[in-house]
Swiss-Prot record:
Name of the protein described by the UniProt record: Putative pterin-4-alpha-carbinolamine dehydratase
Native source species: Streptomyces coelicolor (strain ATCC BAA-471 / A3(2) / M145)
Keywords associated with the record: Lyase
GO annotation (BP), single: tetrahydrobiopterin biosynthetic process
Pfam families tied to this protein: Pterin_4a
Length: 101
């Protein structure tokens, strides 16, 4: 069963619990700054592991000292769903362990 899109109000409610995350072009987005390129690359690998575990994959971009994510659900027509919120929460939890801010 495909994930159901969240209403605009539901998206705003979820974003209120995810500091640093925002809605941009219909996607949940967040950028993190890390202490080095290696630390950023390590975080990307960790995020990829979580994405595999959840079977839900975001657009994930590695920069010099940065990691950026854009999350939405393809099977829900590109809308934001609870799957996206769960992935954002999991990424937020692991980011602190990588020294991301």
């Amino acid at each position: 069963m495909p994930a159901e899109p969240l209403s605009p109000q539901e998206v705003e409610e979820r974003l209120a619990t995810l500091p640093g995350w925002s809605l941009d072009a219909g996607r949940l987005t967040r950028s993190y700054r890390l202490g080095s390129h290696f630390a950023a690359a390590a975080m990307v690998v960790h995020v990829a592991q979580v994405q595999e575990e959840l079977d839900h994959h975001s657009d994930l971009t590695l920069g010099y000292h940065t990691v950026a994510l854009a999350v939405h659900t393809h099977s829900a027509g590109g809308a934001v769903t609870e799957k996206d919120v769960e992935l954002a929460r999991r990424v937020e939890d692991l980011a602190a362990g990588h020294g991301a801010h």
